[in-house]
């Protein structure tokens, strides 16, 4: 699938290894990995940030190959999953930052236009998450209350 508001097709990506078993050099147990995930989630880190920390600092290439389940599933099982999905959260955060910028710079027409694009992405993503039941059907994005969602 291509980009929404530009011409890019977005076809480059990293190739996942075919072998689904953990690497032979990895000596970390699944319970230790889950414990690290819980500790990072309690500090307030998002699932993607947890994955980056595990990869870069602890040498765990794929959590799923070690534990058998993904980071978000582990967090959901322990009740630590974020209430708003991560990609939607960061789009809302971006919209709040643009609105704050527009309060100071009222004549910035390009930012007004970009805010419209970001908010249309938010609405489209929210519609998808309501359909897949990751968000409650009554959830609605409102620009006035958005800053409390990301605070």
Curated annotation (Swiss-Prot):
Biological process according to GO: translation
Entry keywords, A to Z: Ribonucleoprotein, Ribosomal protein
Protein's name according to its UniProt entry: Small ribosomal subunit protein uS15y
InterPro entries: Ribosomal_uS15 (IPR000589), Ribosomal_uS15_arc_euk (IPR023029), Ribosomal_uS15_N (IPR012606), uS15_NS1_RNA-bd_sf (IPR009068)
UniProt family annotation: Belongs to the universal ribosomal protein uS15 family.
Lineage: Eukaryota, Viridiplantae, Streptophyta, Embryophyta, Tracheophyta
Taxonomic superkingdom: Eukaryota
UniProt-listed SMART domains: Ribosomal_S13_N, Ribosomal_S15
């Amino acid at each position: 699938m291509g980009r929404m508001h530009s011409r890019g097709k977005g076809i480059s990506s990293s190739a996942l290894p075919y072998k689904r078993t953990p690497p032979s050099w990895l000596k970390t147990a699944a319970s230790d990995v889950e414990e690290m995930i819980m500790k990072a989630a309690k500090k307030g880190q998002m699932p993607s940030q947890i994955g980056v920390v595990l990869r870069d600092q602890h040498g765990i290439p794929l959590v799923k190959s070690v534990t058998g389940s993904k980071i978000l599933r582990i967090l959901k099982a322990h009740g630590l999953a974020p209430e708003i999905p991560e990609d939607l959260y960061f789009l809302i955060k971006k919209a709040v930052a643009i609105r704050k910028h527009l309060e100071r710079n009222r004549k910035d027409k390009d930012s007004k236009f970009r805010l419209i694009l970001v908010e249309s992405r938010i609405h489209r993503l929210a519609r998808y998450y309501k359909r897949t039941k990751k968000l409650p059907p009554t959830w609605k994005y409102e620009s006035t209350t958005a800053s409390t969602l990301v605070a």
